[in-house]
C-alpha cells in the first residue's frame, strides 16, 4: 500500500512528537537556587495558588539579575508541559520569570523610596494548548529597605532671635530633619541631632532638635549674631549612619540693659539776645548702647537759673535734647544762664535696675551775646481817642520808646505813611507827641490804625515799631433823612384817614443813647387838605389822607414835604419830599392804572416833545445813510482836468497774463508792434565776434513762427548777457502789442521817419491831446528840424 504525501507528513509529525515527550520524561528539571521559594502544597482538594510575599533588597548593584523567588503549581509534574507567565507592575521590564521553572529575577536596580512594593499576577498555562491550568493568582514583591538616604533639613537654613541676657536653657528655635528610609524597618530613619558649631553659647536637644542657650548673660552690645551648624544623623547616631547639616543664624535682640550716659559733664553754648522765642539754642545727646525703643530718651531741666527762660524737648528721630527759648533774652538784664539737665530712658526694664540708675545729668551753660537792638516802645499798643470836631494841630496823645542797649542812644519818631495814606496825623520826631494834621470825619473812617517808627539816632537801621489805634468820637454833624426814596400811591376812591405810606429815617451819626427822630409836616403844608402825618414815636411816621375824591384828571401827582429832627446836641433837621401818585384802583384798593405823564413830567418833557425828538433823529439818520450811499456810487470823471498836462502823469500797467483759457486764444501779432525791430543785446565786456543784422519784422508771419523767433531772440540775449544767472531759471516775458489803431505810444521808434502811420486824427480829440497831435501830426517835420 502506498502512502500519499499528506498521510506521510502526518505520520512524521506523530513520530517527532513521541520522541519529544520521551526525552522530556527522561531529562531532569533544573534545580533551583538555594534561596527559599514558596509553592502550593501537594495535598489539596482544589487546585489553587497560595503565595507569601516576596522580598528583594533595594539598590542591588550586581551584574547578574537578582533572584527574587520561585513560582510553582501542583499541576506541574516537571515534565515541561506547564509554562509560567508574569503580568502586572514591572513585569518584563523589571521582573522576568523563567517560564519552565517559575524562577523570578529582578533585572534593574530598585529604590524603595521611589516604589515600596510591586503587585504582579502569576499564570500557569498548558504549553500545548496555551490554556490556563490554574486560576490567575496575585502576589506582592516588597522592596526591602537599606540605609541609603541621609537626613535632610527641608526648612533650612534657619534664622532665629533670642533676647540678650537670657538665662541658660532659653529656647531659641527647633530644627527638623527627615529621612526618606523606612521608619518601620531598622534604624535607618531614626535621627539624632548634634551641634557642630556654636558651642559653648548654644546647645541642641538630640531627639527634638530644639536649640537652647547654653551661656547666661550674652550681651548684644558685645556680639549680636551667632552662626550655628546643626547635624542630623540616622542609625541613632551610630557609626556608619548617614548625616546632613544645616545652618542656624541666631540674632540677639535688644533689651534695655544699658543706662543713658552724657559724653561730657558740662556744655557751653552762646546765643545772641536777638533770638526770637522758640529758637533753638543748643542740642545735647546722651549716649545709649541700646537700640530702638530701648534707646528712646526723655530730657528735662531739673535745676538752674533758666527754668522759666528755656525748655528742653526730645527729638524722636535723633534722640537729642533740643533746648529752645521760652522768653526773650536781654543781655542788659542777664548775661548767662546755667541749666542742670537730666536724661532718662522712657521705658526702663525692672530686671536690670540693679545694674545702676537708668538716668544721667549734665550741666549746660548758655552765654547771652549783646547785639544792637532796635528801640523798644513802652507799650505794644497805644489806644487814643479824638473828637471829629477837633481842630487841626490838636494833641491826641504821646508814644515813648527807648534804646535797650547800654549806650541808650536817643530815639527819633516818625509815622509809617503806608498806614496813614491821607496824612491825617503828625508826630513830633523828638517827643513822640501825635497831633491832627487834617479835619477828621467819623463817618468816613471811625478808627485809624497807624504804625509809629522809632529809630536810633546813631544807627538809623535799627527801627522799632509801635502801634497806635485812634478812635474818632462822634458829634452830631449829620441831619436825618429818609431811609429810602419814598414814592407812594393814593387811590381815587381812598377814604379820609386812610394810611397810604409808612416812613422811617436814618442818621449817619451814632449818638451814645441811640437815635430818636421826630416827624412833622412843614409849616406851609401843615394845613393842607390832602394829607396829614402821624408821628408813631418809634422813629417812624404814617401818612394819612384827609379827604376823598382824588381825581387823576385834576392832579395826578402830589408832593408832600416832611420835616425830620434828630435828638442830637445841638439837634439837626432836614426836609424830605414824599411823592404821592393818584391811581385808579379796584375794589380791593390795588392800583390798576396811574398817569404815565407823571413819570415824564419831572424830566421836563411831554409825550409830544419826545415824539418830535425821535422823528428828528430818524430823519437825520436817513439823510446820513443817503449821503454815504451816493458817495460810494460816485464815479471818477472820464476826462482829466484841462489845466493838467498829460506829460506830467505816469500811467502804470500792471496787468499780468491770463490763465490757460486766455492763453489758448492768444494772438502774438496783436500784442506787439511788429514794425519795431529790436537790437540784439551784446556783452559790453568783450568785443563781439559776429555782427548781428537787424531783425526782420514779423508782419504776416504765422503765430508758430513768431513764437519760435521770439524765444530764439531771448535765448541769444541770455547767452550774451553777463548779468544772467549761471543756472537755469524760469524767464517770463510779456508783450504790449499794437492793439490800438495808434499802435504803441511808448515806443521811441514811433516818431522816426520810417513810420508810415498817420496821426492826423489826434487833432480831433480835443484840447487834451493838442500837444500829442503837434508831436505826431503833419507838423512833426518842423518839430524835429
Swiss-Prot record:
S-S bridge residues: none
* Lineage, uppermost ranks: Eukaryota, Metazoa, Chordata, Craniata, Vertebrata
Mark which residues the record calls propeptide.
28-47
Among Pfam families, the record links this protein to: CADH_Y-type_LIR, Cadherin
Q: Which UniProt keywords apply?
A: Calcium, Cell adhesion, Cell membrane, Cleavage on pair of basic residues, Glycoprotein, Membrane, Metal-binding, Repeat, Signal, Transmembrane, Transmembrane helix
Q: What is known of its domains?
A: Three calcium ions are usually bound at the interface of each cadherin domain and rigidify the connections, imparting a strong curvature to the full-length ectodomain.
The alphabetized list of GO BP terms reads: adherens junction organization; calcium-dependent cell-cell adhesion via plasma membrane cell adhesion molecules; cell migration; cell morphogenesis; cell-cell adhesion mediated by cadherin; cell-cell junction assembly; homophilic cell adhesion via plasma membrane adhesion molecules
> What PROSITE patterns does the record point to?
CADHERIN_1, CADHERIN_2
Protein's job:
Cadherins are calcium-dependent cell adhesion proteins. They preferentially interact with themselves in a homophilic manner in connecting cells; cadherins may thus contribute to the sorting of heterogeneous cell types.
Q: What CDD domains does the annotation carry?
A: Cadherin_repeat
Official protein name in the record? Cadherin-7
Q: Carbohydrate attachment sites?
A: 449, 530
- GO CC: one term? catenin complex
Positions on the Extracellular side per record topology: 28-607
Any one GO MF term held by the record is: cadherin binding
Enumerate the Cytoplasmic topological stretches.
629-785
Q: Where is the signal peptide?
A: 1-27
